[in-house]
Amino acid sequence: AHGASLTNIEFMQMMPGFIEPKRNLVFNEKTWRYVTFDQPVDIANEKLDDLLEQRSGYGPFTSRLASRAIDLAVDQAGAEGLALHYDFPRENVPEFVQTFATWLQDEHGIAPSDEMRVAMYAHAANGGIKIDRTAYTGVEGLYACGEATGGMHGADRIGGLSSANGIVFGRIAGASAARAALDAPEADAPVDVALPEHGIATAVAERLTRCLKHTMSAYCMINRTDAGLSKALQELESLQDEATTLNKPRANDSEIAALARLQSQIQLAAEMVKAMRKRTESLGSHYRAN
């Protein structure tokens, strides 16, 4: 509505994490080499050890390497997660393994030999608001940096660099904004702006948000297909229609905020899916199964 653009929003960092025996725990990617699967996976036994070793070298999913087969096996296990346990060496244990195993045991009561279930989590965005070398967004007076922006990570963001991104482009954005403010004409007197009055019941917003999460998890994680992405767009359109139908006038502040947040999330999700459909080849974190 204001003139800024998005870039690279089809590229997401997706990483494995625990869902059993405890949810939302980080899975240390360096420990893949010590994993034993407790259920069948569609990987030849003679290739499995090499793929696990390769997969131990980086965190987020990439379609670029053969070890994508490990992530695809996790994704194929679905919402129940892939069952596995650790078989750590008894001698010459690397320090990071000792630290991780101790943390699991002491902080969460999980022994390495316990069965665990791992699923894929959406971790961070590679894309975002498009900026130029001065951090300018294309909207007069508006500069951006950090996780809200895209373009500096590319298709594969196998490591972090979030702090470096924020520091480097934060400095650039701050300096650019300061120069623009010095050159800008004096602002006009503020005018009264009509605030929105329509909102949506909190319970309804929570239900529609759960539906939104389900749609994006089902069709827009690792295994992306044209049919699945088309289905996602249909479901998002239905959610937007339902949010419009169920909103109400003279809402309270919480309900107004809930509607604005929900509609923005649905709109962003739809733009992400369109970008995923448009890119028909696999590239970096974007994997097209067909």
Please state what every model-predicted region is.
Residues Y136-I158:
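Short FAD-binding loop at a beta-strand-to-alpha-helix junction that anchors the flavin cofactor
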Residues T99-E140:
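FAD/FMN-dependent oxidoreductases across multiple families
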Residues A4-P112, S176, A180-L182:
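An anion/pyrophosphate-binding glycine-rich loop and adjacent beta-alpha core
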Residues A180-E255:
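Long, amphipathic alpha-helical stalk/connector segments used for oligomerization, subunit docking
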Residues H2, G151-A177:
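A conserved FAD-binding loop/helix module that cradles the flavin
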Residues Q13-E20, A119-A125, E186-H198, H286-A289:
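A glycine-rich phosphate-binding loop feature that marks nucleotide/adenosyl-phosphate handling sites
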Residues N252-N290:
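C-terminal amphipathic alpha-helical interaction region
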Residues T31, T134-A135, G284:
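Glycine-centered positions within short beta-strands or beta-hairpins
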